[in-house]
Design a protein with these regions (language model features):
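Mid/C-terminal beta-alpha module of Rossmann-like enzyme folds, strongest
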Residues: 47-106
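Non-catalytic, hydrophobic alpha-helical segments
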Residues: 41, 45, 62, 73, ...
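Flexible, glycine-rich beta-alpha linker
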Residues: 1-13
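A conserved pocket-lining segment of Rossmann-fold NAD(P)-dependent short-chain dehydrogenase/reductase
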Residues: 15-36
Length: 148
């Protein structure tokens, strides 16, 4: 299940966008998410094994080429359904009443950390570049759930 534009795992946000309804985002929607495709995670591991000594003792991120904001993500996801995103923003404390406790906690964790990693080290030491963007990883996941 992909993390959705609200920062949680519910498919409800995607369904709201598909239906052209207003999607409420927490805070200002400028927090970031950084998805990764499973093939790219495996690719980093495989490249590290193949490279050998230059990878020993090193840590590598496995992420797509760049992070996305909640707002940008919502707009892109709406376009997959042929829609324009109708977005509204609420302070987290107000917004969390709209979702389950689990989703509210997940969103808060993502907002507080606002993940954004770099693949530069993997490129430099392993000659590895991810094959998939954030959006490609999410789209493929949604397709597997029959949501696209």
């Amino acid at each position: 299940m992909p993390i959705n534009p609200q920062g949680c795992k519910s498919l409800d946000a995607f369904r709201t966008l598909r239906e052209g309804k207003t999607l409420y985002l927490p805070n200002f929607g400028m927090e970031t998410l950084h998805h990764v495709h499973a093939e790219d995670v495996a690719g980093v591991f495989f490249a590290a094994i193949q490279t050998g000594k230059s990878a020993y003792g090193e840590g590598f991120h496995a992420v797509s080429p760049r992070a996305v904001t909640l707002t940008g993500y919502a707009r892109e996801a709406a376009s997959w359904y042929g829609k324009e995103a109708d977005l509204a923003y609420e302070p987290y404390e107000t917004w969390k009443a709209r979702v389950s406790k689990e989703d509210a906690e997940s969103a808060l964790t993502h907002m507080l950390h606002s993940p954004s990693g770099s693949m530069e080290k993997a490129k430099r030491l392993l000659d590895f570049v991810p094959k998939h963007t954030n959006y490609e990883a999410v789209r493929e996941c949604l397709q597997s759930f029959g949501e696209l």
